[in-house]
Regions:
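Non-catalytic pre-domain segments flanking phosphatase-related domains
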Residues: 2-161
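Alpha-helical substrate-recognition element adjacent to the catalytic core
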Residues: 60-79, 124-126, 130-231
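Short, glycine-anchored, charge-dense loop/turn motifs used at functional sites
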Residues: 163-167, 268, 449-451, 662
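Hydrophobic anchor at the start of a short beta-strand
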Residues: 195, 220, 259-260, 278, ...
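Charged, low-complexity intrinsically disordered terminal segments
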Residues: 296-736
């Protein structure tokens, strides 16, 4: 390695050596390694710390460039190293990443100024990650400020240290511990723990934390920052700390990092900490337990976690850890993307019901489908079948400030039908961020506790009308045009979990007790050979849907199909970039939020639909430019479609991901921030190759008939200005 290619070092050390050389040996302690600190030592350390802090400041990093974040992982795990190059992007063609003094990899520089590489985590230890910018001849032309830490866990129990302990001025309103954290940290290290720091906040406070760690001479370790700002999540004053904390612990364990303990400003033996099997302690508790000799229990817990990981497949381990779901064998699954067939199958299932029909919808709106649904349910109720019907209060306009949905009123008039509006808003005092954003987005149907439908369809014509069933001419309103949607029908032991999910919500929302003679949880025998799991996300309580999608992306080796038409949350965007970095094919089938004619022009529609279309496509553009194959759905020709071209480009409402012809997810969860954080969702993950291959064959047929979006095409370019303006101005609260 030449001098100009010297690997990134601690800036304080580099400044120290330069200063010593200039001083001509005046202060030999500088290079002799003397522990006493000279004035020059202190100046070099202070200036170096300042430069490192600049490299950790998000705003300065975007301007001047720098490595994005510290990483904590385990040996052999895939690790993404990323950097923003800032103004340095203009100086070269390649970014060269270093891990300590070794070149870890290179990435070409494009117009985004963002670079990333994937490596396999090295042996346990603490490594410095830096980046240099090189020209087309491989010569270094710029050295980015600062470095980040790659911490590879050793297998010892890991304690996450809350930043509030070292940043007392940032923990406003919280009691600060009387015991200095340094004493507790030393005790934990002496007992065999490995340390890492974490912060959960609206803003990215990484630079302040780093500065304080240096000032207090605290042990170096990765600083893990979970900020709403970086997730483009508008929190609207809602406290996300518990949700992000459990997410952080689960994600680290999924990577083989045995987190057993959290060191924070107050003891919290809470339901959440018990559920995550983590011990929460204050510094004083640590010292007390160290004296009592009871800190060593964590080592056995860490060892057991690593043994469990070694016994599991990568997919099962990640889903087990990040979603707290369990795989259930012995099921049969059937997917349906044809709206007309879905309607006929659903009504046939109602006719087959002998004891109970349980239904949950997000939206129930006036439509021909809904009228038929109401009649069918009343018929079955009068035939002796008990019907339990749940709707989201806000989006079905039921029990919100006294409002009543007349469709639901007809159901409530029947003796054998019970109706609940989930999360009603009974007075203006209840109107607030949580009541408006924390909604129940699930769509479930369970027949006799033996058959279930988990899907994305609401009660409306656009969800249950086939593209060949609706007359469409050039001036047909967007609202009349069907959407692409999907459900998965389940029979077998997994149905019990769907039923239990429904019943938990039913009872939590005040539903009537189940009669003793009505067995809503019958014993279920295997009906097939397919394994699957139910992923349930509770809004503001966990991030199970987000974790499900990230886990599926992270285990993919060959290809991924995504069917969705919502802006993708940054966590999943980064996961998609990791897919592309390891040459995994990514096909994204989307639609048009305002339906288009075959030539790409819009059908008549409300303005907000067209603005939403521009915003979503604007959010997809970086993925398209990075290498994602983006397709806009086009329906087959139909005698019922007489609009120009004889075909339409409809909205895509399905929420479907399929990976490697091995595993598929279908349900209610979009890939956006609303589904990831705010609303409650339910998806089924089918871990069966035959099912996945069948679904992917359907998707590929849809893609073959669709329009491949090309950033250089006139179709894409003609709306570029609109996308740019709307993406910039669209209020984040609407899609986060």
């Amino acid at each position: 390695m030449t001098d100009e290619e010297e690997a990134p070092q601690d800036l304080g050390e580099r400044i120290r050596r330069i200063a010593a050389t200039i001083a001509g040996g005046v202060d030999k302690r500088l290079l002799a390694g003397d522990d006493s600190e000279s004035v020059l030592d202190a100046a070099a350390r202070s200036f170096g710390a300042t430069m490192e802090r600049w490299g950790r400041n998000p705003s300065l990093r975007r301007l001047l460039g720098g490595v994005q974040r510290d990483v904590l992982t385990s040996q052999g795990e895939r690790v993404e190293l990323s950097a923003s190059l800032g103004v340095s992007a203009k100086l070269g063609t390649t970014a060269r990443f270093y891990v300590d003094d070794a070149v870890a990899g290179e990435a070409p520089i494009d117009s985004s100024g963002e670079v990333r590489i994937l490596i396999n985590a090295p042996a346990p230890g603490l490594y410095r990650v830096g980046v240099k910018v090189c020209n087309d001849k491989g010569k270094v032309v710029s050295d980015l400020i600062g470095y980040r830490l790659l911490q590879v866990a050793s297998g010892r129990p890991v304690v996450l240290v809350h930043a509030a302990l070292v940043l007392p001025h940032l923990s406003a309103g919280r009691p600060h511990p009387r015991t200095s954290p340094i004493e507790a940290l030393r005790a934990l290290v002496d007992e065999g723990f490995e340390l890492a720091y974490f912060d959960i906040h609206e803003k990215n406070r990484d630079a302040s934390i780093y500065e304080e760690l240096l000032r207090q001479r605290l042990p170096p370790a990765a600083i893990l920052v979970y900020s709403a700002e970086e997730e483009e999540l508008v929190s609207l004053g809602v406290d996300f700390v518990n949700m992000f904390a459990s997410t952080a612990i689960r994600r680290l364990r999924a990577k083989g990092v045995p987190v057993t303990t959290v060191l924070t400003e107050r003891d919290e033996d809470s339901e959440e900490s018990r559920a995550e099997q983590v011990t929460v302690m204050t510094p004083s508790t640590v010292l007390r337990r160290a004296l009592a000799g009871t800190l060593g229990d964590a080592a056995a817990q860490a060892a057991e976690l690593l043994r469990d990981k070694a016994r599991s497949s990568p997919l099962d381990w990640r889903l087990d850890q990040t979603t707290k779901s369990r795989v259930v064998p012995g099921n049969s699954f059937a997917a349906e993307l044809d709206n007309g067939k879905a309607r006929r199958r659903l009504f046939a299932a109602f006719d087959e019901a002998a004891a109970t029909i349980h239904i949950q919808f997000y939206i129930v709106r006036p439509s021909d489908f809904t009228e038929h649904l109401i009649v069918k349910l009343i018929q079955r109720a009068r035939a002796g079948v008990t019907v339990r019907f749940m709707v989201d209060a806000l989006y079905s306009d039921q029990d919100v400030l006294g409002r009543v949905n007349p469709l639901i009123l007809s159901l409530k008039a029947e003796d054998n039908i019970e109706v609940i509006a989930v999360n009603p808003i009974e007075s203006r005092k209840q109107v607030g961020v949580s009541s408006l954003k924390k909604r129940d987005h699930r769509k479930l149907v369970i027949i006799d506790g033996r058959r279930a439908f988990v899907n994305g369809r609401n009660a409306g014509d656009e969800y249950f009308s086939g593209f060949d069933e609706v007359p469409v001419h050039d001036n047909t309103r967007h609202e009349r045009i069907p959407w692409l949607d999907a459900h998965v029908e389940v029979s077998g032991p997994l149905v019990r979990e769907v039923q239990e999910t429904f019943m938990r919500t039913w009872h939590r929302q005040g539903g009537a007790e189940i009669p003793a003679d009505q067995d809503v949880l019958p014993k279920l025998e295997p009906t097939g050979s397919a394994a699957g799991r139910l992923i349930v996300h509770r809004g503001l309580a966990d991030t199970n849907g987000l974790a499900m999608y990230e886990s599926l992306f992270d285990v993919a080796e060959d290809h991924v199909y995504i069917v969705n038409d919502f802006p993708i949350v940054p966590t999943l965007e980064r996961a998609i970039y990791r897919l592309l970095a390891r040459d995994v094919s990514v096909k994204l089938l989307t639609g048009s939020a305002t339906a288009r004619r075959d030539d790409g022009t819009f059908f008549p529609a409300p303005l907000h639909r067209t603005l939403f279309e521009y915003m979503v496509k604007g959010k997809f553009e970086p993925l398209l430019l990075a290498g994602v194959e983006l397709y806009e759905l086009v329906t087959p020709p139909s005698p019922m479609i007489v609009a120009r071209g004889g075909r339409i480009r409809p909205y895509v409402h399905a929420k479907l991901v399929s990976v490697d012809g091995l595993v598929t997810s279908i349900g209610s969860a979009n890939l956006d921030a609303t589904a990831s954080f705010w609303e409650s969702e339910a998806n089924v993950v089918v871990q069966d190759a035959e099912f996945a291959r069948g679904v992917e064959a359907i998707l590929q047929k849809l893609i073959d008939g669709s329009v491949a979006l090309d950033p250089e095409s006139q179709y894409w370019k003609r709306e570029r200005a609109q996308r740019a303006v709307v993406s910039t101005l669209w209020p984040g609260t609407f899609y986060s």
